Amino acid sequence: MLYPRIRSRALGLVLLILIAWLPGIAHGDDASAPRVDSIVIDTPAGARMLSVEIADTPALRERGLMFRHRLPDDSGMLFLYETAHPVAMWMKNTYIPLDMVFLRADGTVAEVKTGTVPQSLDVIESAEPVKAVLELSSGNARKLGLEPGTLVRHPFFGNAD
């Protein structure tokens, strides 16, 4: 009679652990998809609006645009950081060439790295502390006129109208 009681308690303990653990999996960073938002780029030809996925958690920033096979010209991914710091990126498991636009805390472009090599493990670093990185399909930074000093507007930078 002792064994059924122990087995019952063990089963109850396992169920309790699973009940406590499963909601964390369902709502953890790894399970969430990036939210989509808009940015406005002040270009020489006028304001351009782009749709961007927001990568604002460690898990979303780590995954980035990995495993994607295409990125529309009117979209990108905006990596947001709590504090300005030197940022290092790479192209591991990223199948499409990208332009990386490093952004200061006020939303101005610090520098642009163009034509990154898909799946490369080379480190792509910002030359100065930045608060965000905008990734676009390769060639789009030039098409949009993104260069040092260009303003990118988004509520994160406190400069959205």
What are these regions (language model features)?
Residues 2-13:
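Bacterial N-terminal signal peptides that target proteins for export
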